[in-house]
C-alpha cells in the first residue's frame, strides 16, 4: 500500500468514519451503498484484507470450549466420517453450474483447447469411472442400511400399535364384562328382594287371622273342637321346621355368624337363639348400611352441599334407623291398634259389657229396628289398643306402596299395569261424564242425605205417668186442672174463687 501524503492524512482526520454493518455483505447491497466496495485505486488484495478486518472488528476472542476439547478424539464410526474438501472447490462447483458468456475470440481458443482436454479426459475417464463405481457401491450400501433401519422402525411401530390396540380392546372388553356382571347381579338382587316382599305380603293374611285365636288356654278348651289339638300340633311342627330352615339359610349367607339350631324345640329356646343371631347380625348390618349409604351420597353429590347436612335425608341409614327405633314404646303401641276391628276369641271390652248391661235395662218398646245394636260398640272399639293382637299395618303399607311404585316405574310398556294405568288416564282425559239434561231445569237435582240415626238425642229409661201428661196438656191451654176427686160443692166454690182470681201469665198459653 502506497504511503499517504500529508494532505491525505489531514483530510482523513477531518472526514468522519462511516459506520459499518456486517449484514450488508450478506444481504448483497448495491455498489453505491455497499460498505465493502472500494473505489480508491489500490490492489484487490489490500481491499479484501480491509474488508475482512472490518467484518471481524466486532469479534471477541474466546478460547475453545470444553465440550469441543472432549469430543475431538471421539470415533463415531464410518457412517459419520465425511470427506475433506476446500471452500474453493465448493465455489468452483457452483461457478461451473452458472452459464457464462464468452466472446467470439475466446470460442476459437476454446475449440483448440477442447482437443487437448479430450486427450486428457480420456486418461482421467478411467479414474473417474473407478471413483464413480466406488461411490455408487458406497451409496448403495448406505441406502440399503437406511432402508433396513426404516423398515425395522416401521415394524417396531406396528408392533407397538398392535400391542396398544389389543390392550385397549382388552380393557374395554373387561370393563364391559364388569358392567354386565354388575347389572346382572343388581337384577338378581332386585328379583330376590321382590320375592321376599311377595312372601311377606302373602304372609299378611295369616298374621291377621292369628289375631282371632283364643286369648288363653281356658278359652281354647271351651271353644275347641275334636280336631283342634291335632291341627295345633301339626302347625307347631311346621313352624319349628320353618325356623330351622331359616337358621340354616342365615348360616349359608353369612359364614362369620354361626347359628346353632336348639335341640329342644320350645319357644323360649328358639327366642334365645334368634336374639343371639340378631345381635351378631346387627354390627355387620350397620357396617354395610354405612358403606353403601356413603357410596350413594358420594355418587349423587350430596356431600358437596353442606348447608342441608342436618336434614334427616342427608344422614346415614344407620342413624335414620336408630332415630326411628328410639321411641320403642310408641312403636309397640302402634302394633296393638285394632285397625281391622278384629276381636280375639274370649276377649270382651268394657264398652261391650256396658252395652250388654244397658240392653237388659231397656224395654222392648224402645227398640228401633232401623238402628243396629252393635253400631256404637263397633265405633268405639275400632282404633283402640288391644294387647292380644299384633298389627303391623304401617310397615305393610310402606312395603306395598314401594312394590307397586317400583313395578309401575320399571314395567314394560306391554305389561298389564302400565296398560291399565294408561287406559285410566285416557278415560279421565277423553271420556268426561257430562250430563246434558241437567241445565235449564230439565232435570231435578237432589242430594241423598246420610241417615241421622246416630245423631238422634238419647232417650232415658223413665216414662211419664197419667197425671204428668194431663198436667202438661192442661198447661198448654192456659188452665189449671185439679186431678184430685172432690165433691160438687167444693167444685162450685172453687169455680167461684177461680172467677175472682186473675190467671197468672207464668204458664204456657196458646192464643194469648
From Swiss-Prot:
Protein's name in the database: Protein BFR2
Gene name as annotated: BFR2
Major location category of this protein: nucleus
Region (Disordered) residue spans: 1-151, 342-378, 488-512
GO BP terms in the entry: maturation of SSU-rRNA from tricistronic rRNA transcript (SSU-rRNA, 5.8S rRNA, LSU-rRNA)
Superkingdom: Eukaryota
GO cellular component: nucleolus
Xref: InterPro entries: AATF, AATF/Bfr2, AATF_C
Biased composition (Acidic residues): 104-133, 488-503
Localisation: Nucleus, Nucleolus
Amino acid at each position: 500500500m502506497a504511503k499517504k501524503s500529508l494532505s491525505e492524512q489531514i483530510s482523513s482526520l477531518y472526514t468522519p468514519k462511516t459506520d459499518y454493518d456486517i449484514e450488508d455483505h450478506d444481504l448483497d447491497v448495491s455498489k453505491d451503498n455497499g460498505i465493502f466496495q472500494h473505489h480508491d485505486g489500490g490492489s484487490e488484495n489490500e481491499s479484501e484484507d480491509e474488508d475482512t478486518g472490518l467484518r471481524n472488528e466486532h469479534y471477541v476472542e474466546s478460547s475453545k470450549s470444553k465440550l469441543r476439547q472432549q469430543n475431538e478424539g471421539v470415533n463415531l464410526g464410518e457412517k459419520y466420517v465425511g470427506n475433506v474438501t476446500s471452500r474453493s472447490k465448493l465455489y468452483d462447483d457452483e461457478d461451473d453450474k452458472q452459464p457464462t458468456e464468452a466472446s467470439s475470440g475466446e470460442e476459437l481458443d476454446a475449440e483448440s483447447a477442447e482437443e487437448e482436454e479430450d486427450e486428457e479426459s480420456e486418461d482421467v475417464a478411467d479414474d473417474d469411472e473407478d471413483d464413480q463405481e466406488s461411490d455408487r457401491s458406497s451409496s448403495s450400501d448406505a441406502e440399503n442400511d437406511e432402508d433396513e433401519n426404516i423398515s425395522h422402525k416401521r415394524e417396531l411401530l406396528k408392533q407397538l400399535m398392535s400391542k396398544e390396540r389389543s390392550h385397549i380392546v382388552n380393557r374395554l372388553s373387561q370393563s364391559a364384562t364388569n358392567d354386565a356382571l354388575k347389572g346382572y347381579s343388581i337384577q338378581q338382587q332386585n328379583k330376590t328382594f321382590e320375592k321376599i316382599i311377595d312372601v311377606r305380603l302373602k304372609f299378611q293374611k295369616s298374621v291377621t287371622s292369628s289375631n282371632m285365636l283364643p286369648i288363653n288356654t281356658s278359652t281354647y278348651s271351651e271353644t275347641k273342637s275334636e280336631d283342634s289339638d291335632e291341627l295345633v300340633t301339626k302347625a307347631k311342627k311346621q313352624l319349628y321346621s320353618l325356623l330351622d330352615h331359616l337358621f340354616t339359610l342365615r348360616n349359608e349367607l353369612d359364614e362369620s355368624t354361626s347359628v346353632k339350631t336348639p335341640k329342644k324345640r320350645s319357644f323360649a329356646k328358639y327366642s334365645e337363639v334368634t336374639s343371639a343371631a340378631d345381635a351378631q347380625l346387627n354390627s355387620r348390618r350397620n357396617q354395610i348400611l354405612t358403606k353403601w349409604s356413603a357410596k350413594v351420597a358420594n355418587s349423587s353429590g350430596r356431600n358437596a352441599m353442606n348447608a342441608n347436612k342436618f336434614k334427616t335425608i342427608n344422614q346415614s341409614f344407620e342413624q335414620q334407623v336408630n332415630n326411628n327405633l328410639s321411641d320403642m314404646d310408641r312403636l309397640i303401641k302402634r302394633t296393638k291398634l285394632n285397625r281391622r276391628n278384629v276381636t280375639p276369641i274370649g276377649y270382651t271390652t268394657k264398652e261391650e259389657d256396658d252395652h250388654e248391661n244397658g240392653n237388659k235395662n231397656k224395654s222392648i218398646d224402645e227398640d228401633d229396628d232401623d238402628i243396629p245394636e252393635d253400631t256404637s260398640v263397633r265405633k268405639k272399639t275400632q282404633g283402640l289398643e288391644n294387647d292380644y293382637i299384633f298389627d303391623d299395618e304401617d310397615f305393610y303399607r310402606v312395603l306395598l306402596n314401594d312394590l307397586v311404585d317400583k313395578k309401575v316405574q320399571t314395567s314394560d310398556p306391554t305389561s298389564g299395569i302400565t296398560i291399565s294405568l294408561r287406559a285410566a288416564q285416557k278415560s279421565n282425559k277423553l271420556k268426561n261424564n257430562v250430563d246434558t239434561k241437567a241445565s235449564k231445569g230439565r232435570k231435578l237435582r237432589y242430594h241423598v242425605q246420610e241417615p241421622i240415626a246416630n245423631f238422634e238425642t238419647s232417650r232415658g229409661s223413665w216414662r211419664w205417668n197419667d197425671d204428668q201428661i194431663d198436667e202438661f196438656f192442661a198447661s198448654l191451654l192456659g188452665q189449671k186442672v185439679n186431678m184430685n176427686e172432690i165433691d160438687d160443692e167444693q167444685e162450685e166454690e172453687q169455680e167461684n174463687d177461680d172467677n175472682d182470681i186473675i190467671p197468672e201469665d207464668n204458664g204456657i198459653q196458646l192464643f194469648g
